[in-house]
Amino acid sequence: MGRRRGVMSDEFKYELAKDLGFYDTVKNGGWGEIRARDAGNMVKRAIEIAEQQMAQNQNNR
């Protein structure tokens, strides 16, 4: 079974890494070099953004 294709674009992931303060780690060592805590915070922030967008879309109806 192949790996599941990512839902987040690379551009969005880099933007989150910059916002959360570990972009230099990604730039210098790749995504495999980030801490599990940083990866978790990135997913948490992505979910928050998605929820905000969904709420905004629902309010615009």
Curated annotation (Swiss-Prot):
A family per Pfam: SASP
Q: Does the keyword Zinc apply?
A: no
Q: Which InterPro entries match?
A: SASP_alpha/beta-type, SASP_alpha/beta-type_CS, SASP_sf_alpha/beta
What is a biological process (GO) this protein takes part in?
Answer: sporulation resulting in formation of a cellular spore
Keywords, sorted A to Z: DNA-binding, Sporulation
> Which residues does this entry assign to the site Cleavage?
E15, L16
Give the molecular function GO annotations: double-stranded DNA binding
Q: What does this protein do?
A: May play some important role in either sporulation or the dormant spore.
What protein family does this chain belong to? Belongs to the alpha/beta-type SASP family.
Q: What is this protein called?
A: Protein SspF
